[in-house]
Amino acid sequence: MEIRVANKYALGKKLGSGSFGDIYVAKDIVTMEEFAVKLESTRSKHPQLLYESKLYKILGGGIGVPKVYWYGIEGDFTIMVLDLLGPSLEDLFTLCNRKFSLKTVLMTADQMLNRIEYVHSKNFIHRDIKPDNFLIGRGKKVTLIHIIDFGLAKKYRDSRSHTHIPYKEGKNLTGTARYASINTHLGIEQSRRDDIEALGYVLMYFLRGSLPWQGLKAISKKDKYDKIMEKKISTSVEVLCRNTSFEFVTYLNYCRSLRFEDRPDYTYLRRLLKDLFIREGFTYDFLFDWTCVYASEKDKKKMLENKNRFDQIADQEGRVKQN
């Protein structure tokens, strides 16, 4: 039986699950256009879909921000219909054998910085910068990196007065420990600097293949967070960025030098990485490491579909001849 949302979208296959609920593909029953549908139980102890839908509305119109087409409650579920995107940078990283070239990292960093700056310009911080929350588009937007998942985002300043939230300590870790800034580990209220520092760790993860604080054995979540923090603090920026360009050392040192209310100089950081891009003689051609691999995976799928279709036709023709 076909399940419909808002009497307009036919629910298809499940794409994934999260702490909030499930994500499905859906088709507009008239245009047959595909969308992503997020479902959250109305009995959820920590509902976040309403909050996230409001965030998408505030961020609406931004480059690389998914558009929300419908939000509401049907039956036992809170539902949000939004743009269907391609795989995440984490998925593509795995597809590329868990290592990105310097060229891909720099082209990716440029777009990711733009997305983070845009979110900040709308008075919010993301608080969960990680490869899983950056997705490529589909079709004509396959080279455009999108930022998603605003369930943990927080307003860091007043929309009108631009008064910054106060400095606080003793906060629990919000986000993903692997990429969290040192100040976040120390329990300090997050601000713009923390999103930028987290991006620095994402870039090193892409370049190195892993981070020194991955795979630490722990007896509890708190113990794991503590061990990650200890390793992160004890690993100097120079050691972390060993065998990479000095620009990454400069990037992370800059992030760590920012004060709580400081506005990061996004232009300076982009220029820093663009200068490295130019010095290496790269061309900004939007050909990422995954471009050929991802395309060939899709081609393989199409070939398999065509082969199956051909086999079916041949089978039918065979039956006709036998009859």
UniProtKB/Swiss-Prot annotation:
Cofactors, names only: Mg(2+)
PROSITE patterns: PROTEIN_KINASE_ATP, PROTEIN_KINASE_DOM, PROTEIN_KINASE_ST
Molecular function GO labels: ATP binding; metal ion binding; protein serine kinase activity; protein serine/threonine kinase activity
Binding residues annotated for ATP, in chain numbering: L15, G16, S17, G18, S19, F20, G21, D22, I23, K38
Residues covered by the Protein kinase domain: 9-278
SMART domains (UniProt xref): S_TKc
Coiled-coil residue spans: none
Active site: D128
EC code: 2.7.11.1
Family annotation (CDD domains): STKc_CK1_delta_epsilon (cd14125)
Transmembrane segment boundaries: none
Family that this chain belongs to: Belongs to the protein kinase superfamily. CK1 Ser/Thr protein kinase family. Casein kinase I subfamily.
Name of the featured protein: Casein kinase I
Organism for this UniProt entry: Plasmodium yoelii yoelii
Source taxonomy: Eukaryota, Sar, Alveolata, Apicomplexa, Aconoidasida
Encoding gene, per UniProt annotation: CK1
